[in-house]
Regions:
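Acidic, proline/glycine-rich low-complexity IDRs
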Residues: 1-136
Length: 136
């Protein structure tokens, strides 16, 4: 998950002027919860899957983002390992309206369509908790 850079990070580059005031510990917590889900359920995520977070992505924050979609990471791509190729994914935050739209037709093609719309404005799919624009 790529997030808006935080203000105290001297090595970060701003995307569209968005800057977070604090380190994105909420993103680490979200990824830990998703890892627990995968471990317990034995279900993994692939490109163009989505999942609700059942709460705002960051608790006690004014954000419309309540779920994540998974997309191929166009920057990192994939890596070849002795056990085969691994395609790297990234998560991007989605709003309730976008989540509801995906649930109407929960196919990878529909998620890909949403991701394509998002990439037009945000090619790196940076998750900005302050995002108010909805793509559907």
């Amino acid at each position: 998950m790529r997030t808006a850079p935080f203000a105290d990070d001297p090595n970060s580059e701003s995307f569209g002027g968005a800057v977070a005031l604090h380190e994105p510990f909420w993103a680490i917590s979200l990824m830990q919860n998703l890892a627990k889900y995968v471990y317990k359920s034995k279900k993994w995520f692939e490109a163009y899957h989505f999942i609700p977070s059942n709460s705002p992505l960051r608790l006690n924050a004014d954000t419309k983002l309540v779920g994540v979609a998974f997309a191929p990471d166009t920057v990192l791509g994939g890596i070849d390992t002795p056990n085969g190729r691994v395609e790297l994914l990234q998560m991007v935050g989605i709003t309730q309206r976008e989540l509801d739209w995906l649930r109407e037709d929960p196919t990878t093609q529909r998620v890909e369509s949403l991701i394509d719309m998002m990439r037009k404005d945000n090619p790196l799919l940076i998750t900005n908790l302050k995002r108010t624009k909805e793509y559907i």
